[in-house]
Amino acid sequence: SEQLHESYKASVADNEILKDKDPSYRVLNLNDPWQDTSTSYYHKSIGGYHAAKLRRYQELIDHRLSPEYMSTVQSLQKAKTEEDVMAVFASTTSLNMLNMRYIIYNPTQRPIRNPYAYGNAWFIGQVQIVSNADAEMKALDSLNPLETVVVDKRFANNLIGFVPQKDTTAAIVMTSYKPNVVTYKSKAVSEQLAIFSEIYYQPGWKAFVDGKLTPH
């Protein structure tokens, strides 16, 4: 409605981000992101609020995203040069994994663009099997998500027989995005393991590979 739109009037930062027509990025508003709802009015937001929380994602917020958010705020407050700012994002691996391309630091100013965002999907070269979900979370403290995926041993059977092979020509990109349909296009000369920058939620979703319904 017009009243709602007025309540969420676009800021300078919002308008600048909206110039980017790529469907694949996310935005982090540094103004209390886990309670903020305004960012989601215009953008795919890393933050936001809902009373009914997905437990696994909430654990990711508590153990990885919130500490990286706090570190980002503190580091930006101390940064004196553009190099200082860019160095901040090199270490925010979990936020980069969620494809954080833009950061709203001051709504009245242009957003900060993060050159380290991983994109909406990528292929990895190593698989690390761990004992449980807690070990998965702990592994995120040290692994490079662009190179390695960590997998709970409960799902190890899904990878039987798969050996990652380096393919420098392999690529996977999002071609369209809707709340209930996300489409990707990929190319590779050998079998690859794709990592998607999404929250896994099985009920209601179906996966298709080359048009064929595929278990997920």
Describe each PLM feature range.
Residues 1-53, 112:
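Extracytoplasmic
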Residues 18, 48-63, 67-216:
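Flexible, solvent-exposed extracytoplasmic
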